[in-house]
């Protein structure tokens, strides 16, 4: 049951009807039944993996809570006869017990994920990667860690925990939800509101447009060049990398738009996963705009715990008298950042190329932080000398283009078959680049065998420019295009909606002879 298919549309509509027909207090049962049914339909017996995650998530959070309450009760009962040191020692013993329970849940779930994703023997045993396992594992283990940290109260209802872990729209490719932002929305039972249906449907339409019109058309160029990248000039290797940046963004954000739109029809607001990332002026800013829920998860559960740990704080103190205040303040956080990006890289796959992907991003950000004072002085001198404004149009364009080039280097490791090929592709892109080869006629001549003709290339360019124009307006005017459309008079509103449907039907890349491309992040 593909995300963009008639079967899935019928499933969602049927579930919507059932959801709003039931009394409010029972509506979450409909979501749970629909979510589990959906997972069984698409994954068959692999549903056992998500059931295991549900059970360990529920059991560990309840256990942690019981240990904490028992500890607090005993400490309270000995308020008069225990001194401060005794209370401290007892609490430390209790904390270690709770850590053990948390680690048990983490090791069980991340262990299964690692075995299925990174150990070759899993494939030999006939075990495939269960759909969405990375996403629901990260989400549920984040909840376990939040309970341990006493950020949230554990949910006592097993079925409600099951719904939080398995909510069907996000199971394929996220977004990765934080418990206290999503859980209550799932359980409360929402009223039927026309505005939710309208805004959700518009977001779904927008996601389908990005996927079918742009992403599935662009993927032909990428597959064609990456099949034998050394047979092409550096110009077309670079061109394929740029197209990949476009295709990945259209594919992933399109899928997330569909997911968020469906959730919104049920009255549920899911976290934003993209915020116009290619308008970023630095790599750090990019990672705050791209795959935002994964970035938030890694910051909350890897970066911050590392950077404020005793070992890292002591390292900072050791650095201060030797290298000065700036290095002592920044370097520990930079090392934590590099470790975090290594985890992000490895999350994408077991191939060494993903390790290099993580290292590239982490090291570039680390160098930017370490040399920030120097960069600031150089930039300040440049702007003073030229009379240009630091936040003017010229500076913004240069910053955005430079950041995009840094992003693009990372993508070489993503699209190449392996790390060695990625390095060869990078070298070729620098030493064998000829801008004259980027004319449409030359592109058709050299890449025509990929299955796209001049019409497809022009359509890809026009639709991409339209997409980025809309994104530019949203970015600069702080405008939600859906609110803009729904605020228009009825004839214009429907004209825009019908135009979107027309674009999908007429210009969508599907039909006889076309192999539909899966969403990229389904594989994770």
Identify the role of each PLM range:
Residues 1-523:
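Membrane-embedded transmembrane alpha-helical bundles that form the catalytic cores
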């Amino acid at each position: 049951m593909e995300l963009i298919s008639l079967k899935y549309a019928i499933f969602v509509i049927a579930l919507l009807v059932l959801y709003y027909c039931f009394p409010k207090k029972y509506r979450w049962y409909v979501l749970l039944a629909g979510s589990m049914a959906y997972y069984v339909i698409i994954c068959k017996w692999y549903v056992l993996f998500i059931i295991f995650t549900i059970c360990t998530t529920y059991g560990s959070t309840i256990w942690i809570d019981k240990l904490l309450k028992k500890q607090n009760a005993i400490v309270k009962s000995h308020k008069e006869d225990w001194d401060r040191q005794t209370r401290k020692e007892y609490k430390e013993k209790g904390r270690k017990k709770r850590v053990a329970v948390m680690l048990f849940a983490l090791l069980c779930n991340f262990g299964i994920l690692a075995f299925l994703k990174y150990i070759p023997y899993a494939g030999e045993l006939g075990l495939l990667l269960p759909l969405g396992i990375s996403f629901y594992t990260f989400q549920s283990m984040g909840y376990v860690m939040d309970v341990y940290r006493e950020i949230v109260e554990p949910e006592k209802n097993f079925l409600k925990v099951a719904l939080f872990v398995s909510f069907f729209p996000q199971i394929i490719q996220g977004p990765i939800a934080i418990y206290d932002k999503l859980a209550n929305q799932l359980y409360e039972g929402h009223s039927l509101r026309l505005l939710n249906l309208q805004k959700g449907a518009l977001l779904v339409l927008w996601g389908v447009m990005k996927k079918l019109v742009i992403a599935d058309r662009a993927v032909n160029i990428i597959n064609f060049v990456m099949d034998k990248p050394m047979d092409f000039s550096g110009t077309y290797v670079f061109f394929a990398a740029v197209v990949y940046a476009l295709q990945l963004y259209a594919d992933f954000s399109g899928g997330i738009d569909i997911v968020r739109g469906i959730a919104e029809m049920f009255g549920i607001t899911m976290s934003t996963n993209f915020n116009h990332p290619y308008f970023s002026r630095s790599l750090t800013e990019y990672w705050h705009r791209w795959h935002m829920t994964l970035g938030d998860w890694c910051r909350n559960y890897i970066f911050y715990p590392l950077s404020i740990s005793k070992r890292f704080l002591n390292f900072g103190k050791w650095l201060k008298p030797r290298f000065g205040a700036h290095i002592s303040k920044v370097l520990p956080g930079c090392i934590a950042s590099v470790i975090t990006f290594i985890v992000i890289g490895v999350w994408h796959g077991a191939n060494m190329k993903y390790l290099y992907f993580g290292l590239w991003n982490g090291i570039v950000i680390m160098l930017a932080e370490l040399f920030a004072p120097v960069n600031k002085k150089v930039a300040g001198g440049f702007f003073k000398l030229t009379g240009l404004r630091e936040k003017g149009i010229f500076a913004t364009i240069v910053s955005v283009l430079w950041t995009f080039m840094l992003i693009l280097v990372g993508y070489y490791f993503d699209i190449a078959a392996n790390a060695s090929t990625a390095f060869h592709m990078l070298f070729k892109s620098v030493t064998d680049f000829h801008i004259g080869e980027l004319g449409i006629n030359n592109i058709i001549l050299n890449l025509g065998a990929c299955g796209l003709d001049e019409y497809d290339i022009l359509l890809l360019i026009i639709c991409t420019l339209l997409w980025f124009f809309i994104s530019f307006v949203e970015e600069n005017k702080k405008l939600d295009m859906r609110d803009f459309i729904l605020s228009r008079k009825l004839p214009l509103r429907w004209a825009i909606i019908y135009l979107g449907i027309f674009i999908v039907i007429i210009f969508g890349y599907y039909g006889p002879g076309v192999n539909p491309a899966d969403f990229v992040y389904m594989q994770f």
